Design a protein with these regions (language model features):
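Polytopic transmembrane helical bundles with strong interfacial aromatic enrichment
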Residues: 1-229
Length: 229
């Protein structure tokens, strides 16, 4: 009762929602584990990705709340302004990449095509018929999942460069530092992904690749937060 009257009602609602999401995350976690208890010893990559996505979503909500609390502000992540579309699109792509990263992990898709920049001798995996859209949309196929995961990384990089060119063009000097921090992390993440692949998924490198995604989301949100005036 004390906190109900002392804490801003909107903040209280937010914390209750986080509590509900954490409880739901527990349910999703059990749902994931249950997929490996019957007829298989590994878990469904779809359920794994759902569990991971929920974790990152909760983490992102808390980080955004922390930024507002620290700066005594009330910035809205869903602010509907065209100038922020490219940054929001970048964050969307990063979350999509995390999902496909879970697919790669769940399917052990990193154990095939362990070459870069080509997938063996070709840009496209040679065991997929890209003329048949059903094969390309088969997210149970290791080759398809790895191909999409690779190319999402390229897309994220080019979108980020586009954002950087706009920052330079419009001389948004207050974004130079957060942009460079994020740029360094993106380069590190890409390098770790490549090294994990060509090292036959060395456990340390693969783990660092996964862990660094947490910092990537943190600094992406920091970059977006500072871009909102």
């Amino acid at each position: 009762i004390y906190f109900f009257f002392k804490i801003d009602f909107r903040k209280l609602i937010f914390l209750y929602l986080i509590f509900i999401l954490v409880c739901f995350q527990g349910i999703v976690g059990w749902y994931m584990v249950a997929s490996g208890l019957v007829d298989r010893i590994d878990v469904s990559h779809f359920r794994l990705s759902a569990h991971l996505f929920m974790a990152f979503f909760i983490f992102s909500c808390l980080i955004w709340y922390y930024f507002n609390l620290k700066n005594n502000s009330s910035k809205n992540f869903l602010l509907n302004k065209s100038e922020f579309l490219s940054i929001k699109f970048l964050i969307f792509l990063m979350f999509l990449q995390i999902i496909f990263g879970a697919f790669v992990s769940g399917l052990d898709a990193g154990k095939i095509y362990q070459t870069w920049p080509l997938m063996n001798q070709s840009y496209f995996p040679d065991d997929i018929n890209f003329k048949d859209y059903r094969e390309f949309l088969n997210l149970n196929d290791m080759s398809v999942v790895q191909f999409i995961h690779r190319n999402l990384a390229y897309l994220i990089f080019f979108v980020f460069i586009y954002i950087g060119l706009n920052i330079k063009k419009f001389k948004k000097t207050h974004l130079y530092a957060p942009y460079l921090y994020l740029f360094a992390l993106i380069l590190v993440q890409i390098a770790l992904g490549i090294l994990a692949l060509i090292s036959n998924l060395h456990i340390v490198i693969a783990s660092l690749h996964q862990i660094s995604s947490i910092f990537l989301i943190f600094f992406s949100l920091n970059f977006y937060f500072k871009s909102i005036n």
